[in-house]
Amino acid sequence: MNNVLSTNIAGKEMKVEFGKIGMLSNAATFMSYGDTVILTNVNASSEPRVGIDFFPLSVEYEERLYAVGKIPGGFIKREGRPSEKAILNGRAVDRTLRPLFPKGYRNDVQVVCTVVSVEKDNLPEILAINAASMALCLSSIPFTIPVAAVQVGLIDNNFIVNPNATEREESTLHLTVCATKERVMMIEAGGNEIPEDIMIDAIKFGFDECQKIINFQEEAVSKFGKEKDVPTLFTVDEEVEKDIKEFASDMIKEAMYITDKDERNAAIDAVNQKVKEEFGEKYEDKFGDIKEVLYNMQKKVVRHMLLKDKRRPDGRAFDEVRPLGCEIGLLPRTHGTGLFTRGLTQVMTVATLGAVGDIQILDGIDEAQSKRYMHHYNFPGYSVGEVKPLRGPGRREIGHGALAERALEPLIPSEEEFPYTIRLVSEVLSSNGSTSQASVCGSTLALLDAGVPLKRPAAGIAMGLITSEDLSEEQVLTDIQGIEDFFGDMDFKVAGTTEGITSIQVDTKLKGFSFNVVENAIRDARKARMTILDKINECISSPREDVSLYAPKTETIQIDPDKIRSVIGAGGKVINKIIQDTGVKIDIKEDGSVFVSSSDHAGVKEAIKIIEGLTKDVKAGEIYLGKVTKITTFGAFVEILPNKEGLVHISKLDKERVNKVEDVVSVGDEILVKVTEIDSQGRINLSRKDVLLDQENKENKEEK
């Protein structure tokens, strides 16, 4: 049976089909918004997974190139590993859904969102969140709180819900708001220095728009939703809980109140060891219960410390930033380096400048795009004092790299202002909370050190939240450290400049958070950001006047677009010879902009001279210094500009009669010649005789 339901969202039809496809999945839906369609399949294991202390949720965001009528490139001609954008979209779906499952639910759950049709005006990543929530709500899986997502744009101080492709180009804000009926669940934002008040209003606007989609989901569930399963939730053995609390409660409290991180961790390890020695044999098959009890005890102490004692684990005020350190120019051969330290969090960011042609080409379900600014983030095990295998970047590294990239993107100078490709790499050297925002600060330092003329310096800060169990009390924290992140309820990352916000990323462990939290976090984040920017300005207040000695030197010239073929030559013969002879990189745009890059400045000058010669028009009446390239019985061929030759007829070689060309010139000689004619076929006629006569006349006049 095919169940169909539709509604109107922002002037476009949103439709869900349920029951027709994926009959063996717990729930499968086709959800469309305009011509963008997501196939969503959700399934769960029948029994909880034993021996784990987390919820095993897997969210897969699958892009199919047939969705945009493309055939994958390469030899295999099929989709490979997910693109970076697909990974980020999958993370957004996961972060929105995960807190809404029942506490203690340990069944394996898989959500697969497959993009099967894409209309560029309607983003599939926004629809995927709505489709995933819809499928879970319709399934028998114990997911009962609908969540919705919208994108908010800003054009001429007016908010736009789910802007189309043209509006997204014009918009200064790209905000994704995910919300339930009562609370905000997740926020992602990139903006062109958006003032705090406008950002808060935009989030409220997005929340209100989400309600229409939530009502749509509730209507669908009431009409054809499945009966929900009664889950088996993980609960701690009461006897284990009682014994551990009686034995370790005082020791846990004493350990958690130690201010120094290393000493506190050592004290906690000692308590854990004592508990193991005391109850290891009695509860040898209850290790998971013991671990859960110890975690809950520590969490309770931290919450009491913050909410009742009004103090933080390291003794800071709630709105206080940890001690800051900024340094530039650490590495002698790199193009720019920034070392940013905040408490025990430390990130070194290295900037590399490349030629314009070093851009990254992105080709997926979106239209082909290029990136001339990119940021990569590495988080090795040694940053937290652990032994871990070094592999390629995971989803977390990709997500953090993209977040820091987004924070600085609106501040990067245009290609016309700064003709370089820019790559940043942030190496996390030490991690105790908020390494992604430390990467923003390190990136600012590295870019300024590299001589990149940023619009303004940027900085980032992570805000946190601690609430009571009944949510009656809540406390926003500035610059959360590891322990506050681990036991806290929210990670609210904000980056920006003195003028406004450039990026936000918010996720929570709760079933949402209030607008009061949103407002306080955004306003407190600004105060902290100003403190950090002051410190950055003390270190370096403006970009270096020149790029590094080891960075490529890039110069730009403009040529007639019709002359581009003259520079490239047949099969690239001409441009490849220039590159080979001068050692430069050459990039040519369709509008005639030519970018010449090399670490050898002389090579750049020589290449430009050649290109200008290739594109310069030969004019009748002008005199050129040319090189004899070929001799015939009737005259000599002379190259007056690169790839431009003319003929000096034997009668035009000298003032006197010439019987043999070789009597006057040889191959390789440089001679002055005048262009006497360019015929209808473009052939150039030259005269050495006219030059000699002109010189003779000039000398005669001077003698008189």
UniProtKB/Swiss-Prot annotation:
EC category name: transferase
EC number, as in UniProt: 2.7.7.8
Pfam family, one: RNase_PH_C
Catalytic reactions on record: RNA(n+1) + phosphate = RNA(n) + a ribonucleoside 5'-diphosphate
Entries under CDD domains matching the protein: KH-I_PNPase, RNase_PH_PNPase_1, RNase_PH_PNPase_2, S1_PNPase
GO terms for biological process, alphabetical: mRNA catabolic process; RNA processing
GO terms of molecular function: 3'-5'-RNA exonuclease activity; magnesium ion binding; polyribonucleotide nucleotidyltransferase activity; RNA binding
Localization terms from the record: Cytoplasm
Nucleotidyltransferase recorded as keyword: yes
Protein name listed in UniProt: Polyribonucleotide nucleotidyltransferase
